[in-house]
């Protein structure tokens, strides 16, 4: 019995038709692990940074018609919410498990906060080859950093700084069949390794 990880069939919750039925599927197959990951990694971030982190599991409460295409747990230092702060996320679409750190378009002082990525441009480029960027958290697209030109990356960061709807996340994503999802031990190791790469950007 696993506590933290997800099986390929869990991702099929996103194929269930209808809002109520999909929410039931998420509650059964995905949210229990997100809550466990929330507890584990809020402690992890608190111990790594010396700041108190809180987990925020997506509730999808505002939805009245369209079922969610993704779900997540986010980590931030505000107990009431995470969108206004730089934050970490573990989440899922039907075809990927993603891990991210960055800034949403709703962030307070977004232009100032996003400059951490401008200042640490070289460090972004030096992340391992399987690291990506996400420029819109509502879409699954996450191009590999290694496939972006310097200008592409600079433009993406500038958009987060200067455009109201601009966002910037560094990210990592794996498929539902990935071997790192086969056990809790492998999954937690993958997540800790990823967050260890993200944390310097949080502290910078």
Curated annotation (Swiss-Prot):
Pfam families listed in its UniProt record: DUF1054
Gene3D superfamilies on file: Protein of unknown function DUF1054
HAMAP family: UPF0637
Family recorded in the similarity comment: Belongs to the UPF0637 family.
InterPro entries: UPF0637, UPF0637_domain_sf
Domain of life: Bacteria
Protein name: UPF0637 protein SAS1041
Organism of derivation: Staphylococcus aureus (strain MSSA476)
């Amino acid at each position: 019995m696993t506590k933290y990880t997800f099986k390929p069939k869990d991702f099929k919750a996103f194929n269930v038709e209808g809002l109520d039925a999909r929410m039931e599927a998420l509650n059964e197959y995905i949210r229990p692990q997100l809550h466990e990951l929330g507890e584990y990694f809020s402690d992890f971030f608190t111990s790594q940074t010396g700041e108190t982190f809180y987990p925020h599991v997506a509730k999808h409460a505002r939805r009245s018609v369209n079922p969610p295409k993704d779900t997540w747990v986010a980590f931030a230092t505000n107990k009431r919410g995470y969108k206004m702060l730089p934050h970490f996320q573990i989440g899922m679409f039907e075809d990927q498990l993603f891990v991210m750190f960055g800034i949403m378009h709703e962030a307070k002082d977004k232009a100032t906060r996003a400059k951490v990525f401008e200042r640490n441009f070289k460090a972004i480029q030096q992340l391992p080859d399987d690291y990506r960027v996400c420029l819109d958290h509502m879409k699954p697209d996450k191009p590999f950093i290694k496939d972006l030109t310097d200008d592409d990356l600079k433009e993406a960061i500038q958009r987060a700084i200067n455009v109201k709807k601009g966002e910037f996340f560094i990210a990592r994503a794996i498929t539902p069949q990935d071997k790192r999802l086969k056990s809790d031990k492998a999954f937690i190791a993958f997540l800790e390794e990823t967050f260890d790469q993200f944390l310097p950007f949080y502290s910078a």
